[in-house]
Amino acid sequence: MVYRVYVEKKAGQTHEADSLLREIKDFLQIDTLSSVRVLNRYDAENIEEGLFTYAVNTVFSEPQVDDVSYEVPAGQFVFAVEPLPGQYDQRADSAAQCIQIISQGNRPIIRTAKVYVLAGELTEENIAAIKKHVINAVESREASLELPETLAVAYAAPETVATVDGFIALDDAGLSALLD
């Protein structure tokens, strides 16, 4: 079973969201944006429900400065950003290691994403510009807001790669023939 939790800084601690709001207004010139909320989303699998509940307040959040919720936050526009498949996710890896240490058992599968909740009078062009500003296509992509059935990633078996025997011994004519 996949468990999900959203973690957001409490009022007065929302430095990342406040900074992003200023960036969007200053650099993108989108003055109709009234607020930005930034939440960290954690999905966990291969973990017992009791351990997940314990980890919510010990691994995924700091109760003194974070608010926790289990539902997608309401807002005029919500989107999430996750690392690309194969991209190292330090937040997920650290959380998985901490939970493994706490449980003294197997390491759970953890996936994270940042969820952005925007409010204001925004056009489709404004939203596209904000997404382009927030999503670094080299390392991340827009994530689904739906809870997946599993976090396990299935990779297709690679096809057999043809080998070239005697490549080192090929002369110019042989290399030309190989390229054709």
Residue ranges and their predicted role:
Residues 1-180:
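Core nucleic-acid recognition elements
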